[in-house]
């Protein structure tokens, strides 16, 4: 058929990947990011319920919504108690530590899910996988950088899973507790007044960071615009210190506080791509019946590519 590359579905196992890589075609696999709860290309839930087709890049993510579980019986439907309400929400795929197995299996291209993600997230994820690829090419041990993985969690994660490729299933794949950014543990609430929330920190905190205070029913989040230490405004506070923030969100004593964005980390990552040269291009697409799609791109200096 003249096929040069095949993009495998996310439910492919490492054994299937290894088998298919010997068929004379390049193999592309999904290695990181958001997972679909359904078989690839077969989820019609978003299109049916909300008129937005997941197969056309418009998924409204109904799998990230709250659900209840029922068992149908002769007497009617009985609700089944479940841990959490987000029963269809998968964790995020994370295969950095298994990347050597994928590359050894013959994978030619790695796909990272970046839909609706910030450039800082893309910079961090791509740099980590790039370093791992380079180590594999040079026959070195894959990097085990705990700090970078911690930073990645601060940027975005729903919990991590190795995915179907490495036979994860059930609780190893799903996160029914929360469908959004989990962040990392920042500390705990030790006091709540009419005006302020007092927190004991287990990590450093900076003005401009995003936090979430976990609740029994719902969580509440905000940006730390003002940070107080010993009654005085400060720009940052260190692990182990007691600080206060303005009470803009609900909070209760002993509630866990999580950091959902790190302003210092984001600034560091922006610097890694701030000087990247951007080139304006014009794109011309040609589609004719019976012929393939032709894409022609030309930059301001007249250089042109076509495929």
Which role fits each region the language model picked out?
Residues 3-307:
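Surface-exposed amphipathic alpha-helical tracts and adjacent flexible/coil segments at the periphery
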């Amino acid at each position: 058929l003249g096929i040069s590359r095949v993009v495998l579905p996310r439910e492919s196992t490492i054994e299937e990947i290894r088998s298919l890589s010997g068929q004379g075609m390049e193999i592309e696999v999904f290695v990181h990011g958001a997972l679909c709860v359904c078989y690839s290309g077969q989820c019609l839930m978003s299109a049916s319920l909300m008129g937005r087709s997941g197969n056309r890049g418009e998924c409204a993510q109904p799998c990230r919504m709250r659900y209840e579980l029922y068992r149908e019986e002769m007497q009617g439907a009985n609700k089944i108690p479940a841990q959490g309400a987000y029963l269809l929400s998968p964790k995020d795929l994370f295969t950095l530590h298994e990347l050597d197995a994928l590359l050894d299996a013959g994978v030619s291209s790695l796909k990272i899910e970046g839909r609706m993600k910030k450039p800082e997230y893309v910079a961090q994820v791509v740099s980590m996988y790039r370093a791992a690829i380079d180590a594999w090419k040079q026959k070195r041990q894959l990097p085990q950088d705990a700090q970078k993985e911690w930073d990645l969690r601060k940027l975005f994660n729903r919990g991590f899973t190795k995915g179907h490729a490495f036979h994860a299933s059930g609780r190893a794949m799903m996160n029914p507790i929360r469908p959004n950014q989990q962040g990392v543990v920042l500390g705990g609430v030790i006091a709540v007044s009419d005006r302020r929330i007092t927190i004991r920190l287990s990590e450093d905190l900076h003005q401009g960071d995003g936090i979430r205070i976990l609740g029994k029913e719902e969580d509440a989040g905000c940006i730390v615009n003002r940070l107080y230490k010993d009654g005085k405004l400060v720009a940052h506070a260190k692990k182990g210190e007691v600080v206060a923030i303005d009470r803009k969100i609900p909070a209760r004593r002993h509630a866990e506080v999580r950091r959902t964005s790190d302003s210092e980390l984001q600034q560091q990552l922006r610097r890694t791509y701030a000087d990247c040269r951007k080139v304006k291009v014009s794109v011309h697409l040609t589609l004719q019946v019976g012929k393939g799609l032709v894409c022609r791109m030309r930059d301001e200096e007249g250089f042109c590519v076509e495929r």
